[in-house]
């Protein structure tokens, strides 16, 4: 079956957005890394520690997960996409933030906070 000129043009034009999209994603990753001013070693250490902390609470698929820097509208974000296999069965007590516990402490209860 012979390809028409239209088929050839359509085939060529379909590939262009895919490669342009890939190039754009790569450029955004490079820009995010540069703007964050984080070394590769520090970023790798952060990824490792984030995975360790999350793994304390849920079972995650480390091989399928990703922690990356993303830039959108001049804002850089650290994004963790971690598929959860299952949650842990034990109950976990979370600590209150230090400032919140001071506000709710028995010594300050019933007192006017402006005095």
UniProtKB/Swiss-Prot annotation:
The segment annotated Disordered runs over: 89-115
Q: Which InterPro entries match?
A: MinE, MinE_sf
- Example GO biological process term? regulation of division septum assembly
Membrane-crossing residue ranges in chain numbering? none
Listed A to Z, the keywords are:
Cell cycle, Cell division
Name of a matching Pfam family: MinE
Q: What does this protein do?
A: Prevents the cell division inhibition by proteins MinC and MinD at internal division sites while permitting inhibition at polar sites. This ensures cell division at the proper site by restricting the formation of a division septum at the midpoint of the long axis of the cell.
Family per UniProt? Answer: Belongs to the MinE family.
Could you identify this protein by its name? Cell division topological specificity factor
**Species the sequence originates in:** Prochlorococcus marinus (strain NATL2A)
Give the classification, highest ranks: Bacteria, Bacillati, Cyanobacteriota, Cyanophyceae, Synechococcales
User: What's the name of its gene?
Assistant: minE
């Amino acid at each position: 079956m012979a390809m028409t000129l239209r088929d050839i043009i359509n085939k060529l034009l379909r590939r262009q957005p895919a490669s342009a999209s890939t190039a754009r994603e790569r450029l955004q990753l490079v820009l995010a890394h540069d703007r964050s001013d984080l070394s590769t070693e520090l970023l790798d250490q952060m990824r490792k520690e984030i995975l360790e902390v999350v793994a304390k609470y849920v079972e995650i698929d480390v091989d399928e997960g990703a922690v990356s820097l993303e830039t959108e509208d001049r804002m850089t974000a650290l994004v963790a996409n971690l598929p959860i296999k299952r949650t842990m069965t034990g109950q976990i007590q979370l600590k209150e933030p230090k400032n919140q516990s001071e506000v709710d402490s028995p010594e300050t209860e019933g007192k006017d906070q402006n005095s």
